[in-house]
């Protein structure tokens, strides 16, 4: 039975998509140990917008967040998302390198890198910056809809990505634009050109098709899927770990995630959401 593994997006893309990045460090800390023990490949924690949000609105130190969270998760790499060179504005390269070094020194283990144009030179300096800081690298192949973005285009981009010192690739569908039919041709194309480089799959539920696209990706060879934990899943966020894992099992695959360990996380963030809406119930023990 083929194993399907998962990377978690709850602490980054989940609340970025549904709570406008308003999850504070204090909201995260009670559940980190459970997240760490559930069997995820990695968990997303920060992106450039989260640094700005933490400083400008939440009045928090983002590097302190990284340190406090990663201290509680020794078994699972924390992952940051890097889509551009600037962090707080139009930053010089020296600031970019300092940002990468401080992120790694405070506990960030991996960097998932995008370039809006899937351009080799755009990828290259970001990959070099992550490697210099000592982080593992996951390179995004960003999906969109246009006459240019054909299977042949993604085959060529995948081959270019393999020329860089990366650990993994990720088919990234940030707009939730993939359909099951398009997934059926895209995934085999990328896998055929990725060789022995592992490939993850990341989509959103914006159109409601995200969970179905995940299942199509799994059936066509993807072994690592990005999911979120409810209530920070679905909608404009990523598919629910419960949904994807259950349906993967129904198709004959094995999930390595301990879903029972995740139930208290769901209860915790549901209570956090209710408190934010004014209902203010007591937070359940995690």
Indicate where each model-derived feature is located:
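Catalytic cores and adjacent flexible loops of soluble metabolic enzymes
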Residues: 1-112, 116-286
